[in-house]
Amino acid sequence: MSNVPHELLYTKEHEWVRIDGNSAVVGITEHAQRELGDVVFVELPDVGKSFEVGEPFGTVESVKAVSEIYAPLSGEITEINNEVVDSPELVNEDPYGEGWLAKFSFTTAPSGLLSAAEYERYINDEANK
């Protein structure tokens, strides 16, 4: 069973979101990094670029696959994690900490995100299909 921190929100595309006021930190979940395998490359957008919810904003490449990362909310990139660009293995080692990907600012509260319990049910349902 994946580690699913209860203080975070989640998407069905396996991104996590930590909201703090009008900003949000985004990364991929432990489940996603485990499915991908060893991450070898992370591509993130420039600071200042805006994205709509559901729009791809970067990619994570592993030894098994290349996966797009989707914006869990509409907003502007205010910071990217250059550490993860330089050391992509951080996504595997600490997906909810040092392996975060980007910070967004937003003006409209995000909607459609899953609670930890809802995300756990979702990944269990997906595993049983």
UniProtKB/Swiss-Prot annotation:
GO CC terms in record: cytosol; glycine cleavage complex
Record's protein name: Glycine cleavage system H protein
Cofactor note text: Binds 1 lipoyl cofactor covalently.
N6-lipoyllysine: residues carrying this PTM: 64
Gene Ontology terms: biological process: glycine decarboxylation via glycine cleavage system
Cofactor(s) needed: (R)-lipoate
Superkingdom of source: Bacteria
Keywords associated with the record: Lipoyl
CDD domains referenced in this protein's UniProt entry, alphabetically: GCS_H
Membership in a protein family: Belongs to the GcvH family.
Every Lipoyl-binding domain range: 23-105
Free-text function comment from the UniProt entry: The glycine cleavage system catalyzes the degradation of glycine. The H protein shuttles the methylamine group of glycine from the P protein to the T protein.
Subunit structure: The glycine cleavage system is composed of four proteins: P, T, L and H.
Pfam families according to UniProt: GCV_H
